[in-house]
Amino acid sequence: MALEAAVKQEIIKEYATGEADTGSPEVQIAMLSKRILDLTEHLKVHKHDHHTRRGLMALVGRRKRLLTYLKDTDITRYRALIERLGLRR
């Protein structure tokens, strides 16, 4: 379940560090968080959709790796992003 273009643009506008920034860890983590939230809602309705559950676990792992990278490179940006997204860490 990919994100719609309008939703992507909104996330990029909100979390980008520069004007043409689409690949910073903040933007990537925010997009992954939105997809994870959408898939979690899907799985609440479709409990036996194990194929989607496996994809969800892959997205969670990718987000975790990006968060670890951001934490290792710039702890202040990491803490600000965690607070903005409301993630537990």
UniProtKB/Swiss-Prot annotation:
Alphabetical UniProt keywords: Ribonucleoprotein, Ribosomal protein, RNA-binding, rRNA-binding
SMART domains assigned: Ribosomal_S15 (SM01387)
Subunit comment: Part of the 30S ribosomal subunit. Forms a bridge to the 50S subunit in the 70S ribosome, contacting the 23S rRNA.
Function recorded in the entry: One of the primary rRNA binding proteins, it binds directly to 16S rRNA where it helps nucleate assembly of the platform of the 30S subunit by binding and bridging several RNA helices of the 16S rRNA. Forms an intersubunit bridge (bridge B4) with the 23S rRNA of the 50S subunit in the ribosome.
InterPro entries: Ribosomal_uS15, Ribosomal_uS15_bac-type, uS15_NS1_RNA-bd_sf
Family classification: Belongs to the universal ribosomal protein uS15 family.
HAMAP family on file: Ribosomal_uS15_B (MF_01343_B)
Gene Ontology terms for molecular function: rRNA binding; structural constituent of ribosome
A Pfam family it matches: Ribosomal_S15
UniProt-listed GO biological process terms: translation
Organism: Renibacterium salmoninarum (strain ATCC 33209 / DSM 20767 / JCM 11484 / NBRC 15589 / NCIMB 2235)
Identification of the protein by name: Small ribosomal subunit protein uS15
GO terms for cellular component: cytosolic small ribosomal subunit
Cross-referenced PANTHER family: RIBOSOMAL PROTEIN S15, BACTERIAL AND ORGANELLAR, SMALL RIBOSOMAL SUBUNIT PROTEIN US15M
